[in-house]
């Protein structure tokens, strides 16, 4: 896969001079994602963070970000990871952000949600739980843990405490036939919404993977027709769920997942990706490295903490350094191969970047 390597971006930015920085500075950041930890207590076949993650983001690091969030007019902070609830200071971090006027959104595996449901409902404005099976066997095969009932209990507990989570499903060969059942299960558990995306097998470096990543997660040729039949069925049987937004994606967007899996098999082009996520959001890793999105690493100069970083380094400086400005320019120009096969793109109307959606609606409004 041809890519523009991040270590070349500083030189690229120098070549275009101050014009790039002047015209393409990021002056506002409505959405910031914090990886509270690189550790994870799941053992997913789709992800390698659990194999090597060690670092946590501490309360002091988040406190240092507050002036930058104010300067950049940040409205919403997504706490992710790894598994964010493994960070021993997750509650203090969420409370700090909320106390400073930020909406706080949790993305979790749900393994500890039952234990923390009451506190989570008090601290978060929205919760999204990843759930990749509708029965214990499928869940265990994908997640590597016998924890299906525990996660379902956590979803019910959060709903009972007044904050029904949304459920995010990563469709893959092991679970695509359960597509309609996921909708029924989400309703049974008291979820606010259910959302679907395709497993990312085109980007070998997503989710902490290494260069030797080999996948049998995608649909095979013989699976495409059954999947299309399921899509036809769900459009007919769940019209009201599409209309109400209980199913987050439109029928047309769900069909992009079929197109993606067909493209993996060289049976057509990848669905066109419409995304401007780096223009309104950024991801900050547990060690302070800033990325333009979940799937593309940030350049070396986009660092707000760690060895060799000056104490006055802040988020705005990291976002507008030569390397990050050039990287955003490459993404904007369509020069990053990862973008062409992205399964989780986001688009927000540039005229509405400053609008402040609720945490519960942001993902739906921003989805491409």
Regions found by a protein language model. Give the residues of each.
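Cys/His-rich metal-chelating microdomains
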Residues: 39, 43, 47-50, 278, ...
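Conserved alpha-helical substructure of the radical SAM core
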Residues: 3-119, 126, 219, 223, ...
């Amino acid at each position: 896969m041809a890519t523009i390597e991040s270590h070349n971006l500083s030189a690229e930015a120098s070549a275009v001079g101050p014009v790039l920085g002047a015209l393409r500075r990021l002056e506002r950041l409505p959405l910031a994602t914090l990886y509270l930890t690189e550790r994870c207590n799941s053992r997913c076949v789709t992800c390698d963070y659990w194999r090597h993650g060690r670092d946590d983001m501490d309360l002091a690091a988040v406190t240092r970000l507050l002036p930058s969030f104010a300067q950049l007019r940040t409205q919403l902070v997504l706490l992710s990871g790894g598994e964010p609830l493994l960070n021993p200071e997750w509650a203090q971090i969420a409370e700090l952000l909320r106390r400073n006027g930020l909406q706080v959104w949790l993305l979790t595996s749900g393994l500890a949600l039952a234990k923390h449901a009451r506190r989570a409902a008090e601290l978060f404005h929205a919760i999204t739980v990843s759930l990749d099976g509708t029965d214990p066997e499928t869940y265990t095969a994908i997640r590597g843990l016998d924890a299906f009932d525990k996660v379902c209990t956590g979803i019910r507990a959060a709903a009972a405490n007044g904050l029904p989570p949304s459920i995010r499903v990563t469709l893959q060969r092991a679970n695509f036939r359960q597509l309609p059942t996921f909708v029924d299960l989400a309703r049974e558990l008291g979820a606010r919404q259910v959302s679907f995306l395709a497993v990312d097998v085109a980007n070998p470096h997503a989710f902490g993977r290494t260069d030797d990543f080999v996948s049998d997660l995608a649909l095979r040729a013989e699976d495409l027709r059954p999947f299309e039949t399921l899509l036809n069925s769900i459009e007919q049987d769940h019209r009201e769920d599409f209309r109400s937004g209980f199913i987050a994606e439109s029928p047309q967007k769900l069909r992009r997942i079929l197109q993606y899996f067909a493209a993996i098999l060289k049976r057509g082009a990848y669905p066109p990706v419409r995304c401007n996520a780096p223009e309104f959001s950024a991801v900050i890793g547990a060690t302070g490295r800033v990325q333009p999105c979940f799937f593309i690493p940030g350049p070396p100069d986009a660092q707000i903490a760690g060895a060799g970083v000056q104490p006055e380094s802040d988020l705005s400086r990291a976002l507008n350094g030569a390397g990050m400005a050039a990287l955003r320019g490459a993404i904007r120009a369509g020069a990053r191969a990862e973008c062409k096969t992205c399964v989780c793109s986001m688009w927000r109307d540039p005229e509405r970047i400053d609008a402040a959606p609720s945490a519960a609606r942001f993902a739906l409004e921003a989805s491409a």
